[in-house]
Amino acid sequence: MELAPLFNQMPFARLLGIEVTEATEGTATARLEHSDDLLSNPTGEVAHGGATYALADTAGGAAVMSLAGIVTPTIDMRIDYLSPATDDLVADAELVRYGDSVAVVRVEIHDVDGTHVATAHGTYKTSGQGEETPWGEDSEVGDKVPDDLR
């Protein structure tokens, strides 16, 4: 499944301008262009923390889905803001562990000049998304998850 186009069609990601540029083998990269619509106050140049958080969550979800092959809802996301976001952002997500029911992802967010803006840790649901839930049907993960991530 090609995930970048799928994520780029998600209404919330489109609203914010988040673009998933790659999602494969437990990693993902996403970008967010800095704009006045994302500012935390009308007279500043710092993006609202929620925009950075949404970028991290989108990249983290794409990394998990690249192995799961199913929608993987966020259970928990923790973020440490390290520098003000005053430029375009890039999020690099990497799967830390993929278990039978949850996956853990680490996301590093930098601006385009390389300034470390935030670090996030996310937990995503990897099973139980049956037909009766809003997320759709389960699918088999098969052998896609490397042993060192289990």
Task: Identify the residue ranges that each predicted region occupies.
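Hydrophobic beta-strand-centered segment that forms part of the acyl-chain substrate-binding groove
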Residues: 61-92
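Compact, glycine-rich, soluble single-domain proteins
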Residues: 43-57, 61-62, 76
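Catalytic strand-loop segment that frames the active site of acyl-thioester-processing enzymes
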Residues: 17-45
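A generic structural signal for short beta-strands and their flanking turns/coil linkers
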Residues: 14-16, 26-28, 71-77, 87, ...
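HotDog/MaoC-like acyl-thioester-processing domains
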Residues: 86, 96-150
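Short, charged/polar surface micro-motifs in flexible loops or helix N-caps
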Residues: 35-39, 59-60, 85
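N-proximal, solvent-exposed amphipathic alpha-helical segments enriched in charged/polar residues
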Residues: 1-11
